[in-house]
A protein has these predicted regions:
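Generic structural signal for hydrophobic
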Residues: 131, 154-155, 620
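Acidic-glycine-rich active-site phosphate/pyrophosphate-binding loop
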Residues: 73, 168-181, 339, 509-514
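Generic detector of well-ordered alpha-helical packing
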Residues: 87-91, 144, 166-167, 182, ...
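Hydrophobic helix-and-loop "lid/oligomerization" segment in the mid-to-C-terminal part
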Residues: 2-3, 10-137, 158, 208-429, ...
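Histidine-centered active-site/metal-ligand motif
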Residues: 166-167, 182, 356, 414, ...
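Acidic, two-metal ion nucleic-acid-processing modules in DNA metabolism proteins
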Residues: 98, 103, 239-334, 369, ...
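Short alpha-helices
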Residues: 97, 174-228
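Histidine/acidic-residue-rich, glycine-tolerant segments that coordinate divalent metal ions
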Residues: 142-194
Length: 660
């Protein structure tokens, strides 16, 4: 578990801040946030005041005129069209938007999304051959196809194809009838940040302009959903689209989105980009990871309320299955890391038989959050391992894999994330090679994560008004991250664990006029380092907490540290006292870790500080007196073990470290 972070507070540029305050009339804290994001006056006007009328001409995209003519001709001749999508949320929403639009034009249109495990990402020849056999006249790809030169070449004489994609364009562009991708070298479209659904939406706009002379602005909520989920920069057109899409989502949303919001428990909330990223998108993604992404498309294209509700419930349940799969694999991976000892000091490489390949990427991300090392999670099936990688800031995981390419069957990706396959009997060799590579390329400081802080705030200045002012910068996302503030000194009035699994922490901070609530997700460890009366520094984002008609500011903790830590000192007599307390707290049966820790803090001897008392649990684990495990409900539990004979404290590394 990461205990420390590097706090990096942005420096001030008062001159630029004052210019923004004077020219744009913004609040000083908003001006500082804009300077931190390198937004000048001209960009600031577009950033704050940009509207749908500022969207770019879709015909500025290369090949758009060719694509429009071909689609129109195919519709007029009543020939069948197939939209070939992808199984992530960007692909799901792109498929949905284009399908809904072409249906409005009267097209004979269906869609095809490959199965994640058996077919993989992008175009595959077998699927295209099947579509040709069925008599498909035109295939329009969304969110894929730009790298499929050979596959397009194999079928281009037998079927018309339009490629719409947003991924980096290779040197060899597929020779389809039209290729719409703003990242092509000879495409002069000004905005290079569109998502896959954004490109598909531009095709819809071009077709509608040609037909009616008007802008097509339907389904912006679906476009916003995919844009946020694909983590593209929320600047330029993306910002305009997402801002308008969120307004639609909160006023008259797509039926499927409304039902998804309902089952996710967000129906009484104002939906933000954060809700999309952390709540709605995972439910759509779960279909592609666990079952099939076509169900998510069906949710977004149906006009039947009963069907939408049923599919939303199904996706919600699928997401729970995904979470359970993820939780189980994560627990096994953590055990693997612990068993590796020092082998995991530089890089995390874990593997398991038949781990679900649809969730190993998520598990890799969680392990990075937990241990902050370049991480590879590998699912082994029939002697072949399929791996997913996630990196840390400043370390190129693709280059690391490339240095080991002689060990791998195949690999691909980019600096932050990658995938690969490998013979299972070479995984240990890969771990050794990557360990050596990391020793040579990662400094000790780079293994400490950075929390980038926009500005310091005195604890007494935090109120709802400042949240309202800062909200002018929403929606947040890539290239416009949620502002992070810091309080450099505050006193803890209370601390408690919360949630069904007691895996989240709530800290109550004192202010001159009352208290502030601060929440730390997935940080139960804080209960052992921060206590009532502890003076802390806190890095956080801000949000409103609405409860029983009352609105108050709430801090979402990014990092929290005591300004001074209690020293851990242990004695034989003190441990005897703690043994009695823990034994009585356990009552001869399993108890949750949280309940036992609460009992320890309540009953500990007066001459022992909190950290020392809680550290006794670590010693009792090392001596085999108690055993930690995960209960059936996912909660961390302690089991009491009957140990015969006299206990030898010198066998406890923790006792030897802190004994006095």
């Amino acid at each position: 578990m990461i205990k420390k972070k590097r706090w990096r507070i942005s420096t001030s540029d008062k001159e630029q801040e004052n210019i923004l305050i004077r020219e744009l009339g913004v609040n000083p804290i908003v001006a500082k946030l804009m300077v931190n994001r390198h937004i000048d006056v001209d960009e600031g006007r577009r950033f704050l005041q940009g509207s749908l009328s500022d969207l770019l001409d879709p015909f500025a995209l290369k090949d758009m005129d060719v694509a429009v003519s071909l689609v129109q001709e195919t519709i007029e001749k009543h020939k069948p069209i197939v939209i070939y999508g992808d199984y992530d949320v960007d692909g799901i929403t792109a498929t949905s938007v284009l399908y809904r639009f072409l249906k409005k034009l009267g097209a004979d249109v269906t869609y095809y999304i490959p199965e994640r495990q058996s077919e993989g990402y992008g175009l595959n020849l077998e699927a295209l051959e099947h579509l040709i056999e069925q008599g498909t006249a035109l295939v329009i790809t969304v969110d894929c196809g730009i790298s499929s030169y050979d596959i397009v070449e194999a079928v281009r004489d037998r079927i018309d194809m339009i490629i719409t994609d947003h991924h980096t364009a290779p040197d060899m562009i597929p020779r389809a009838k039209a290729v719409i991708n703003h990242k092509q070298k000879d495409c002069h479209y000004k905005d290079k940040n569109l998502s896959g659904v954004g490109v598909a939406f531009k095709l819809c706009q071009a077709l509608w302009l040609t037909k009616t002379g008007e802008w097509y602005l339907d389904d912006l909520d679906i476009v916003a959903l995919g844009t946020v989920a694909d983590v593209v920069p929320l600047v330029g057109e993306n910002r305009i689209i997402v801002k308008a899409g969120l307004e639609k989502m909160n006023s008259h949303p797509n039926l499927g989105i409304k039902k998804l919001v309902d089952v996710a428990g967000l129906h009484e909330r104002t939906i933000t980009s954060g809700h999309i990223g952390f709540t709605l998108a995972p439910r759509l993604n779960a279909a592609g990871r666990v079952t099939h992404a076509t169900r998510a498309v069906e949710l977004l294209v149906t006009d039947n309320a009963d069907m939408a509700e049923a599919i939303a419930e199904e996706l919600n349940e699928t997401n729970r299955e995904r979470q359970e799969l993820e939780r189980n694999i994560h627990e096994l991976a953590r055990i693997d890391v612990a068993n590796q000892g020092h082998k995991a000091d530089y890089v995390t490489v874990v593997a398991g038989e038949d781990w679900h390949p649809g969730v190993i990427g998520i598990v890799a991300s969680r392990l990075v959050e937990e241990f902050y090392k370049p991480t590879l999670v590998i699912s082994i099936h029939d002697g072949i391992g399929k791996g997913s990688c996630r990196s840390i800031d400043g370390f190129n995981i693709y280059d690391a894999l490339k240095s080991c390419e002689d060990v791998l069957l195949q690999f691909g990706g980019h600096a932050a994330a990658a995938g690969f396959s490998i013979d299972a009997d070479r995984i240990d060799e890969l771990r050794d090679r990557l360990t050596a590579y990391c020793k040579a390329h990662v400094t000790a400081e780079e293994y400490i994560p950075v929390v980038a802080i926009d500005a310091e705030l005195p604890v007494d200045d935090i109120d709802v008004d400042i949240i309202d002012r800062v909200s002018a910068l929403e929606p947040y996302g890539m290239a416009n991250s949620t502002p992070i503030f810091a309080v450099m000194e505050a006193t803890v009035q209370d601390i408690m664990l919360m949630g069904q699994l007691k895996n989240h922490c709530k800290v109550i901070l004192e202010t001159s006029s009352g208290t502030l609530d601060a929440i730390a997700w997935n940080r139960p460890d804080l209960f052992r380092t921060i206590f009532i009366g502890t003076v802390v520094k806190v890095a956080f984002s801000l949000q409103k907490n609405e409860w029983q008609g009352m609105v108050s500011p709430q801090l979402m903790i990014q990092a929290i540290e005591p300004l001074t830590e209690e020293p851990i000192t242990l004695s034989t007599e003190g441990l005897r006292q703690m043994y009695v307390i823990v034994k009585q707290a356990m009552r001869g049966r399993s108890q949750s870790v949280y309940n036992v820790e609460q009992e320890i803090l309540r009953r500990k001897p007066a001459d022992q500080n909190n950290r020392s008392a809680l550290t006794s649990l670590d010693i009792f684990k090392e001596l085999g007196i108690i055993e930690e495990y995960t209960g059936d409900d996912g909660q961390l539990m302690l089991r009491w073990n009957a140990v015969e004979g006299k206990l030898d404290l010198v066998t406890s590394v923790t006792f030897l470290t802190y004994s006095v």
